[in-house]
Design a protein with these regions (language model features):
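Domain-level signature for soluble enzymes in the chorismate/prephenate branch of the shikimate pathway
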Residues: 1-218
Length: 218
C-alpha cells in the first residue's frame, strides 16, 4: 500500500504512519496540499495529514483544503502522543550540558520551556522547519556544541543519541491525524488498532444567527 504523508521523514506524521502502517510504502510530501493532491490523483492510496493538536489547536490549512479544494472522504484517524527528546551527536553524548545552541521547530521549543529554562538558560534557540530537519542538521555537524529536540524516530534516522527523554512540559499533548482516501471505502485495520467508529460532519449554516449551532446539534 502506498501512503503519502506530510514530510519530511522522521517527523511526528511519519511516526504516526509507521505505527499504524508498519509495512506500507511511504512517500513524504513537502506540504499538506501536495499530500492531499497526491491522493486525489491516485499517486498514493492514502494520505495522512495533521488535523488538530491539543496545545496548538486546529490545522486550518488541512480543513480549508479539504472543504474548498479536494473534498476527499476521511476514512480513519491516528491520535499520536507528542513526546519530545533532547538529542545530540554521539560525540557529545557525555558532555551534552556544554551545548550552546538548541535546534528544533518553534512549537517543539515552546513545548519544552520548563526543561530548557532549567538546563539551558543561556543557550540560543534556532528555529527549523521541522523537528526532523533539526535532527538532520545536528547529525551533519558532529563537532558543533548543538542539540536537537525531536522524536525517537528522528534520533534513529540520523544516528543521534537521546540524552534526555520526555522533556516536554505537558504529557497530555497529542496530535490528531486524519487518513484520507479517494474512494469512500472502509479502511481495514488490525483489531488492536481499532478503537470504534467516528463520523465527521461538515455543516454550512444558511445564515449567521444566534443559536444556529445549537439548533444543528439539538
Amino acid at each position: 500500500m502506498k501512503i503519502g504523508y506530510l514530510g519530511p521523514k522522521a517527523t511526528f506524521t511519519d511516526l504516526a504512519v509507521t505505527t499504524m502502517f508498519p509495512l506500507a510504502e511511504k512517500y513524504a510530501y513537502d506540504t499538506i496540499p501536495e499530500c492531499i493532491d497526491a491522493v486525489s490523483s491516485g499517486e498514493v492510496e492514502l494520505g495522512v495529514v495533521p488535523l488538530e493538536n491539543a496545545l496548538e489547536g486546529s490545522v486550518n490549512l488541512t480543513i480549508d483544503y479539504l472543504i474548498h479544494e479536494q473534498p476527499l472522504p476521511i476514512v480513519g484517524e491516528i491520535i499520536a502522543p507528542i513526546q519530545q527528546h533532547l538529542m545530540v551527536h554521539p560525540y557529545y553524548k557525555h558532555h551534552w550540558s556544554d551545548v550552546r545552541e538548541i535546534y528544533s521547530h518553534s512549537h517543539a521549543i515552546a513545548q519544552c520551556h520548563k526543561f530548557l529554562h532549567t538546563h539551558f538558560k543561556k543557550a540560543k534557540y534556532v528555529y527549523m522547519t521541522s523537528t526532523s530537519a533539526a535532527a538532520k542538521f545536528v547529525s551533519e555537524h558532529p563537532h558543533l556544541p548543538i542539540a536537537a529536540i525531536a522524536n525517537h524516530l528522528a534520533a534513529k534516522e540520523y544516528g543521534l543519541e537521546i540524552v534526555r527523554e520526555n522533556i516536554h512540559d505537558y504529557d497530555y499533548n497529542h496530535t490528531r491525524f486524519i487518513i484520507v482516501r479517494k474512494q469512500n471505502e472502509e479502511l481495514s485495520l488490525q483489531s488492536t488498532l481499532y478503537a470504534g467508529d467516528k463520523t465527521t460532519l461538515m455543516i454550512a449554516l444558511p445564515k449567521d444567527q444566534a443559536g444556529a449551532l445549537h439548533q444543528v446539534l439539538s
